[in-house]
């Protein structure tokens, strides 16, 4: 890996939930500004993630958070929608300017390798890429991407909780908990539920 000038680390958050978008982040870390405590976001407490996320945004050479919508998940399937979110993050195609660092495209264009957590790669990437199983535990850039993707998506789900009260999105973040299942049964699916997911599809009716 040392032969490559810069590495883009990529990870996603939100493949499994019944509701909300799937989010991906791409991060190029600065070797001159190491960040202590980077690991898989799922291994960290919410407090630790919230502490690390601004450090990553501050110290990384470049970063971007992107997503694929519920509609894209239902149209493409969750695997392809995840790949779409990853490609968008790698290319700097965030939903807003606040979701990426300045000059992201300029910096990322100099990267020689893309490291993606998992066992499969999206197609049509701008640089050589490798999939690394449990890469969020072994590659700091992937760990950083994992944290940015997770904290960004969690904040989105908290906002959706205000738009669609009663489902408890700020707590379970759209995952299939008992409380979420009970709310679905009581209220029916709402517009941010993934209709292609079986537990939601079984209850399709206006909310």
Swiss-Prot record:
Domain RNase H type-2 residues, every copy: 5-207
Required co-factor(s) are: Mn(2+); Mg(2+)
Cofactor stoichiometry and binding? Manganese or magnesium. Binds 1 divalent metal ion per monomer in the absence of substrate. May bind a second metal ion after substrate binding.
Main site of residence?
A: cytoplasm
**GO biological process annotation, one example:** DNA replication, removal of RNA primer
E.C. numbers: 3.1.26.4
Does the keyword Metal-binding belong to this entry? yes
| Catalytic activities | Endonucleolytic cleavage to 5'-phosphomonoester
Going by the UniProt record, its keywords in alphabetical order are:
Cytoplasm, Endonuclease, Hydrolase, Manganese, Metal-binding, Nuclease
For this protein, the record's CDD domains field holds:
RNase_HII_bacteria_HII_like (cd07182)
The record's comment on protein family reads: Belongs to the RNase HII family.
Protein name in UniProt: Ribonuclease HII
Please name the source species.
Hyphomonas neptunium (strain ATCC 15444)
Query: What lineage is on file?
Result: Bacteria, Pseudomonadati, Pseudomonadota, Alphaproteobacteria, Hyphomonadales
| Gene that produces this protein | rnhB
């Amino acid at each position: 890996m040392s032969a490559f000038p810069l590495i883009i680390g990529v990870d996603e958050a939100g493949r499994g939930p019944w509701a909300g978008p799937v989010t991906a982040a791409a991060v190029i870390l600065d070797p001159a500004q190491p960040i202590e405590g980077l690991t898989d976001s799922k291994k960290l407490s919410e407090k630790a993630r919230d502490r690390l996320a601004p450090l990553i945004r501050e110290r990384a050479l470049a970063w971007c958070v992107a997503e694929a919508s519920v509609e894209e998940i239902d149209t493409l399937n969750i695997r392809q929608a995840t790949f779409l979110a990853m490609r968008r993050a790698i290319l700097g195609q965030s939903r807003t300017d606040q979701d990426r660092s300045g000059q992201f495209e300029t910096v990322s264009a100099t990267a020689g390798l893309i490291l993606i957590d998992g066992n499969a790669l999206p197609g049509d990437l701008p640089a050589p890429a490798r999939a690394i199983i449990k890469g969020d535990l072994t590659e700091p850039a992937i760990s950083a991407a994992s944290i940015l993707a997770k904290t960004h998506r969690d904040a989105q789900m908290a906002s959706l909780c205000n738009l669609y009260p009663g489902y408890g999105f700020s707590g379970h973040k759209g995952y299939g908990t008992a409380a979420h299942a009970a709310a679905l049964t009581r209220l029916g699916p709402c517009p941010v539920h993934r209709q292609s997911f079986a537990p939601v599809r079984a209850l399709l009716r206006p909310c």
